[in-house]
Regions:
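Pore-lining transmembrane helices
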Residues: 1-174
Length: 177
């Protein structure tokens, strides 16, 4: 995420500036994708939407090591911090968990784009701090759109569904060892 940020961040910030100006002027918000859109729907609970991984582990994992780390990561995930999972499970250098880590944000962003395009979720007009908890972040960033908050909840649920098969594979991998 951070590697490509130098390329896409200026574009997203310009789109956000246009949204912010339109919101202040009381005109139609022009851009769906902007910096807060990515924060709200692509990096919820941290890069890779790892809050979905925490939920999947707590429900489906039989690995005590994964469950212990997931329990420690819950308060961090609430504030979009996922380093305990990235380095504790680890996700780094773990092909089983790296795959959903890359897929979940893309699927979530595509879903959120659709929900915004059809008018269910409001467009982003406020750049809430990245540590703002999920649901509240979407609500604030969209200028009070309940649809954006609901969309963010659905995006986390989608991430859980994406992570489940990989958590089950990790269970089987431990059994094989």
């Amino acid at each position: 995420t951070q590697t490509l940020k130098a390329i896409y961040e200026p574009i997203l910030l310009a789109a956000f500036a246009e949204n912010e100006a339109a919101y202040a002027a009381g005109t139609a918000i022009p851009n769906i994708i902007s910096t807060p859109f990515m924060s709200c729907f692509s990096t919820i609970t941290g890069a890779g939407i790892t809050g979905g991984l925490v939920i999947a582990i707590m429900i489906f994992s039989r690995r005590e090591d994964y469950r212990a780390i997931a329990k420690l990561a819950i308060p961090c995930a609430v504030f979009n911090i996922n380093e305990p999972l990235i380095f504790g499970l680890p996700i780094v250098m773990n092909p089983i968990l790296a795959v959903p880590f890359m897929i979940a944000p893309a699927v979530s962003a595509a879903f959120a784009y659709f929900m915004t395009a059809v008018g269910f979720a409001g467009r982003m007009v406020v750049n809430a701090p990245w540590t703002t908890p999920p649901v509240l972040m979407a609500f604030l960033s969209s200028g009070g759109s309940g649809g954006a908050a609901v969309t963010q909840i659905i995006c986390i649920a989608i991430a859980v569904l994406i992570y489940i098969p990989f958590v089950i594979i990790a269970n089987r991998q431990q059994t094989a060892e």
